[in-house]
UniProtKB/Swiss-Prot annotation:
Protein name as it appears in the record: Anti-sigma-K factor RskA
Phylogenetic placement of the source organism: Bacteria, Bacillati, Actinomycetota, Actinomycetes, Mycobacteriales
An MF annotation (GO) of this entry: sigma factor antagonist activity
Pfam families tied to this protein: RskA_C, RskA_N
UniProt family annotation: Belongs to the anti-sigma-K factor family.
């Protein structure tokens, strides 16, 4: 049985994505007022991390649609009849709302998304599936030397999304290497050279497996098969 405090924290992601009804959001606001300071702080920290992550994903993936797209979308809206959608249960509606909110931010097409709602939805990206997962978790931590790293992950989807904000790039002749750490050791999750590290940097982490942490080291160009320098940052994936 989960505690009311854990139930509250589990709603941080849909709250951050505005995927709840007004009544549900109001209930959460009241619960936050009555929650212990530590629980309220953890909830607000996760909300902030999710919104920063989605903003970074939107910035990294946004594209400028061609001018003809707007005309085509508006023409299709005018031609298509209005359809009534069936009412779904609260839990299914919430999951769909989370996926819809995540997709809208990541795709970054603003009001043009209305036109696409009238057509079959594209296959959700890994990031969208992670954010829509019922077991989605958000972990954030400070990086020595400056900046923060946030991992949004789902065991159900076996994937995660890493966002680094204001992390300085590695020194010339080195790369940052990420490692998924499990009982058998450290397994490479990719590298980032100086050109890859921007004010907001995103990366997908597939195949989390049984990893319990995401660790960072500094390695030679191209990376290493195992860590050759001390871990300078680590985020628990629990």
């Amino acid at each position: 049985m989960t505690s009311p405090q854990n139930d509250l924290l589990s709603l941080a992601t849909p709250y951050a994505l505005h995927a709840l009804s007004h009544a549900e959001a109001a209930d959460i606001d009241r619960a936050l007022n009555d929650a212990p300071p530590g629980v309220a702080d953890a909830f607000l920290a996760e909300v902030r991390a999710v919104r920063e992550t989605m903003a970074a994903l939107a910035s990294a993936t946004a594209v400028e649609p061609p001018a003809r797209m707007r005309d085509a979308v508006l023409r299709q809206i005018a031609e298509d009849p209005v359809r009534t959608l069936p009412v779904r249960s609260s839990s299914r509606r919430r999951a769909a709302a989370v996926l819809s909110a995540a997709a809208a931010v990541v795709i970054g097409l603003g009001t043009l998304a209305v036109g696409y709602a009238l057509r079959p939805a594209p296959t959700p990206s890994t990031a969208e599936q992670v954010f829509a997962a019922p077991d989605v978790r958000t972990i954030s931590g400070e990086i020595p030397g400056g900046g923060t790293a946030t991992v949004v992950f789902s065991r159900e989807q076996n994937s995660g999304v890493l966002v680094m904000n204001n992390v300085p790039p590695p020194q010339p002749g080195t790369v940052y290497q990420m490692w998924l750490v499990d009982a058998d050791g450290s397994h490479s999750a990719g590298t980032m050279d100086a050109e890859a590290v921007a004010p907001s940097t995103t990366a997908v982490l597939p195949d989390l497996g049984s990893s319990r942490a995401l660790a960072f080291t500094v390695e030679p160009p191209g990376g290493s098969t195992r860590p050759t320098t001390p871990v300078f940052a680590e985020l628990p994936l629990t």
